[in-house]
UniProtKB/Swiss-Prot annotation:
It comes from Burkholderia thailandensis (strain ATCC 700388 / DSM 13276 / CCUG 48851 / CIP 106301 / E264). Required for accurate and efficient protein synthesis under certain stress conditions. May act as a fidelity factor of the translation reaction, by catalyzing a one-codon backward translocation of tRNAs on improperly translocated ribosomes. Back-translocation proceeds from a post-translocation (POST) complex to a pre-translocation (PRE) complex, thus giving elongation factor G a second chance to translocate the tRNAs correctly. Binds to ribosomes in a GTP-dependent manner. InterPro entries: EF-4, EFG_III/V, EFG_V-like, EFTu-like_2, G_TR_CS, LepA_C_sf, LepA_CTD, LepA_IV. This is Elongation factor 4. The keyword GTP-binding applies. Residues 2-184 form the tr-type G domain. Keywords: Cell inner membrane, Cell membrane, GTP-binding, Hydrolase, Membrane, Nucleotide-binding, Protein biosynthesis. It comes from the Bacteria. Its EC number is 3.6.5.n1. It is a peripheral membrane protein. The keyword Zinc does not apply. HAMAP family: LepA (MF_00071).
Amino acid sequence: MDHIRNFSIIAHIDHGKSTLADRIIQLCGGLSDREMESQVLDSMDLERERGITIKAQTAALTYRARDGKVYNLNLIDTPGHVDFSYEVSRSLSACEGALLVVDASQGVEAQTVANCYTAIELGVEVVPVLNKIDLPAANPENAIAEIEDVIGIDAMDAVRCSAKTGLGVEDVLESLIAKVPPPKGDPDAPLQALIIDSWFDNYVGVVMLVRIVNGTLRPKEKIKLMATDAQYSVEHVGVFTPKSRNLESLSAGQVGFIIAGIKELTAAKVGDTVTHATKSAPEPLPGFKEVKPQVFAGLYPVEANQYDALRESLEKLKLNDASLQYEPEVSQALGFGFRCGFLGLLHMEIVQERLEREFDMDLITTAPTVVYEVVQSDGATIMVENPAKMPEPARIAEIREPIVTVNLYMPQDYVGSVITLCEQKRGTQINMQYHGRQVQLTYEIPMAEIVLDFFDRLKSVSRGYASMDYEFKEYRTSDVVKVDMLINGDKVDALSIIVHRSQSQYRGREVAAKMREIIPRQMYDVAIQAAIGAHIIARENIKALRKNVLAKCYGGDITRKKKLLEKQKEGKKRMKQVGSVEIPQEAFLAILRVEDK
């Protein structure tokens, strides 16, 4: 066991984490040159395209060190984005060490810091690495100063490397072996294995990626999952050297996979503990929690007959993404669809994109909303994640909205514009610190304000230099109201929005104006109104299209013309009573886009 090292790589988006992983795998001969492609561990097309890591992956590598000993290195690739922070904490708790990769030309960024603090809290040894030192803009001294200043770990002897050219990658591994302690654990104790990740394979069912903490596991043994108490019999165990390789057994300190004929992914929850069914461990490993979705949106098929196909696609996605939640819902305007819960905005975009790309779905997505806590006048508290489910204003005692703590990092030139943005978003400043040229701002901002377009706006006011991460803090009483949109006096549920009272007039007017542009003219007048409860706050009219009924009367008597006009008016009136206004798809998307222009 002294020769095993379990480590993961922490880095901000684009600081070269996956490239470094590629180089390490190449150096240890995990794949032949023919099979080597860039970003080996990012197996989803989407991960490659966006250059982000979504699911955790592992590689068990052998490395002959300079002292002649052969070490087993287990690389656990973690997602770097804040939406997947629970997956990150699980991956990190399976390691004893983490390589902190910092781009020498850019210095420390927000997500790096967030994940690094997680690592330090979990007691993981952090080894700083400066990447991209081959760039002309690289400034290693500055980056070292930032690591020490912001994160507070000693970085004087940080390894310098360039993952692109392969320069210094061996030094990274040597430094890893020297600094990271070998795993502790007893191969003869009762089995305890932490599930780092799980996914569904069409041939063998659910594959669980685990780190064995204590004990030994062999095929044909009975195992039990401690969160659900479900029992299964093990078919295969093994490791990934990115390719899978079956082994006789997995013992304490190793990272590998278990295949046990599990049919649904919900049984194998990330962070759960696997143990033997008979000689089971007295207690599960700490840190397991159910992941709660933070952001909700409705997904509807563009064609109503695609509903079943959408349900199947969601079921298949759920096999690989246990944090996705969905339930069927019906909207008067959009027909049948699903209300889906996501970890955050990036997660939502990825799910949408995967549905469109892998399953060929055409989707309409309603505006993302967060979960509000509503205390009713009879004292009961309900959680509302859909504006249509919000009770009538008379029955509400108070509404509490989720508040998140946001950490922002940016060069000092952009502090002013970022502060202005946070103020617009009803943020309260908690803290502000200068680290060299970088500034760290801490704000408390309502989650609803972040969900819409905070991230995009932040990138645009700071020219892409600011980075952020957020975590949920608490529910706080707030003056939020539900704005309904009425078309000819009928509520359109899919267009309802929940906003702060201070912005309700403005937003109501804006949505109404937008709808006027988008809804095509009908044969009769259409009134678009925005209302809070029974109180109308904005109105727009769409004028009717009319045929020129007087075209055939040259000259002639005025009463004849009047008769024809009256007749037309009557017809329009009748039409208006029976007609229903077609609302085009763009109207729903427009709601998303009016957010704070």
